[in-house]
Amino acid sequence: MKDMGEDRPGIGHSTNLVGLPTDLLASAWFNQAAPEIHIAGVREMNRSLFEMLAEAPDLESAGEAFYKYMIAMFGLDPEQQDHRPGQGGAVRRFHASYLRLLKGWGYDTNAKEGAVLKGWVESRFGLFPTFHREPITKFASKAWITYIEEKMTSRFHNNSIYVQLDLMYEFCQWALARFAAPGESALLLYRGVNDFTEHQMIERIDNRQVVVRMNNLVSFSSDRGVADCFGDTILETRVPVSKIVFFNTLLTSHPLKGEGEYLVIGGDYLVKASYL
């Protein structure tokens, strides 16, 4: 990892769990080449899940199987996630859930849930966030310290939350290859912005094409009309399938379904910018 005494963060750590240099993973070249990647050991340690998924006739059935597997593995029954007194007046312990993080992201990408999700990307893919509430310009900044504090919030780290997210990512990759985008290495997605506060301009190719450094986790939409609602500048790019963490039809019921939203791992993207 880059020396923490330096003022400006690099792109990320020198190591990650996907077996590629982080600089390469973050590069515009990677995002255009769109090779396949996996988080080390996740599928191997959860063979029963993927054997069960192989029997699913469609995405809806696969999503239901995944949901039930996660309930069994992590105790995610609704009764186990609230704070109402149980028998004898005891308070049930809150069980952190990947679905709770998605819900929080849907409300505010810069809330504590967003910090935990960005922290997971940093841990697994090696990429530092570039924005959390405000631009992260140096390690000693208030923005960096706030991010570190919030990504470590104990409320969300009592139930192997990063392992839950590992499984969600690998299920997403399996579902894209099997049902949602078979044979595709990248998908055309859109992001609406009002300015480039959250995006670092890396290179201008021409009047409409630029390379921008996206935050380590960002939201896109498959529907340009939806992206229009979030800003008067539309960024259009082809996102590697391997960088999609979650998409709107992955599960039959989840907090992000209404926006046709895709959660995407960041880095340097060649984008076409158009204006409303």
Curated annotation (Swiss-Prot):
It comes from Rhodospirillum rubrum. GO terms for biological process: nitrogen fixation. It catalyses: L-arginyl-[dinitrogen reductase] + NAD(+) = N(omega)-alpha-(ADP-D-ribosyl)-L-arginyl-[dinitrogen reductase] + nicotinamide + H(+). Optimum pH is 7.0. Monomer. Its EC number is 2.4.2.37. InterPro entries: DRA_trans. This is NAD(+)--dinitrogen-reductase ADP-D-ribosyltransferase. Involved in the regulation of the nitrogen fixation activity by the reversible ADP-ribosylation of the dinitrogenase reductase component of the nitrogenase enzyme complex. The ADP-ribosyltransferase (DraT) transfers the ADP-ribose group from NAD to dinitrogenase reductase. The ADP-ribose group is removed through the action of the ADP-ribosylglycohydrolase (DraG). The gene is draT. It is an enzyme of class 2 (transferase). One of its GO terms (molecular function) is NAD+-dinitrogen-reductase ADP-D-ribosyltransferase activity. Keywords: Glycosyltransferase, NAD, Nitrogen fixation, Nucleotidyltransferase, Transferase. Disulfide bonds: none annotated.
